[in-house]
Amino acid sequence: MRGRSLTLSRVKLELARRSMSATSVPSMADFLTKKPYSPPSWASHLRPLPSHTFSLAHLPTPIHRWNLPGLPNGTELWIKRDDFTGMELSGNKVRKLEFLMAEAVDQHADTVITIGGIQSNHCRATATASNYLNLNSHLILRTSKLLADEDPGLVGNLLVERLVGANVHLISKEEYSSIGSEALTNALKEKLEKEGKKPYVIPVGGSNSLGTWGYIEAAREIEEQLNYRPDDLKFDDIVVACGSGGTIAGISLGSWLGALKAKVHAFSVCDDPDYFYDFVQGLLDGLHAGVNSRDIVNIHNAKGKGYAMNTSEELEFVKKVASSTGVILDPVYSGKAAYGLINEITKDPKCWEGRKILFIHTGGLLGLYDKVDQMASLMGNWSRMDVSESVPRKDGVGKMF
């Protein structure tokens, strides 16, 4: 009986291992299909409810232990790999796009407009998703004043965007600040409408009330993954980067309404926490959620030198994490969030001791290519291989040619 019990335990553990990477895995036939949407029961009171969603991401994404150095005794850190949602579509943005692109198609759009920074992961994902669905894409990309009149090049996300045929419109950071993202996208929309196009506008990061459903769904996905486990794993905290607000609004609301009940910590990489509390509140009000943003998420300032700007300590941390755990963080979002988390833990280790933390990796790997010059000094692990005369050659010892 003891042997049978051990066998059953092994089977349960194997099923749990598999379930953390797969719940009800969609078939390949579902990819790029539009389907009627049914919300989780605990979110069915929200309004308006999406009518459809597109299957664009490779879901569910796996969850596994992540042994970052410096964790307090008894603290467990796990990571949800939303950097595995696809290749060209990798990262958190595709979850929002599943809902936004469905609405674009429902409105018979033939063109999609969105806006972001010069290395925007969201813009890259939007360009790819648009191409998949036979829609044209127009990207308004913010860059420095000195570079706004030059070819933006082919580094990182720009390479993918231009490969898939996106129309890139450059603006300076000063123009972006003085005009605003909404006015800029509306101006381009009016121009394209005069040309006979039917454009659909997606805001920065896909962060509006409809896009918020992407991470409400992610909360349901995490619930289902935990339900498959035999060990009653429950997360005390969820940690995620915050760049435009939609992801933290969705995961915080989903955790609050659903069974997770985890404390959500968002690490902002651009604007300050007060801005994001107000912005998230607007998204929640747009869903008639009836909750206060400050009750469902703790927002920490992790922007450091500024958006997409890094200190040497942050880049060294990204390198150290990759070397010690094999997980590659992007320096703009997840890298700053993980760095911020470790700093918070270091400040008050007792507060985190014994807790089970889930870190959501939001992707952005392509952004590393924009940091090559800054990262180069950290990469010393190479040498010229010694192939002296004593090393045998194919046609005889000591012969070089």
From Swiss-Prot:
Entry annotated with the keyword Lipoprotein: no
Induction pattern: By drought.
Modified residues (N6-(pyridoxal phosphate)lysine): K93
Known EC number: 3.5.99.7, 4.4.1.15
Ion transport in keyword set: no
Reactions catalysed, as given in the entry: D-cysteine + H2O = hydrogen sulfide + pyruvate + NH4(+) + H(+); 1-aminocyclopropane-1-carboxylate + H2O = 2-oxobutanoate + NH4(+)
Targeting signal (transit peptide) range: 1-37
Active site: S120
Gene3D superfamilies hit by this protein: 3.40.50.1100
Key words of the record: Acetylation, Hydrolase, Lyase, Mitochondrion, Pyridoxal phosphate, Stress response, Transit peptide
Cofactor names: pyridoxal 5'-phosphate
An example Gene Ontology biological process: D-cysteine catabolic process
Matching SUPFAM superfamilies: Tryptophan synthase beta subunit-like PLP-dependent enzymes
Pfam annotation, one family: PALP
InterPro entries: ACCD_DCysDesulf, D-Cys_desShydrase, TrpB-like_PALP, TrpB-like_PALP_sf
Coiled coil (UniProt feature): none
pH dependence: Optimum pH is 8.0.
GO CC annotation: chloroplast; cytosol; mitochondrion; nucleus
GO MF term list: cobalt ion binding; D-cysteine desulfhydrase activity; hydrolase activity
Localisation per UniProt entry: Mitochondrion
Function: Catalyzes the production of hydrogen sulfide (H2S) from cysteine. Is mainly responsible for the degradation of cysteine to generate H2S, a regulator of stomatal movement and closure. Has high affinity for D-cysteine.
Family per record: Belongs to the ACC deaminase/D-cysteine desulfhydrase family.
Protein known as: Bifunctional D-cysteine desulfhydrase/1-aminocyclopropane-1-carboxylate deaminase, mitochondrial
Biological source species: Arabidopsis thaliana
Gene that this polypeptide is encoded by: DCD
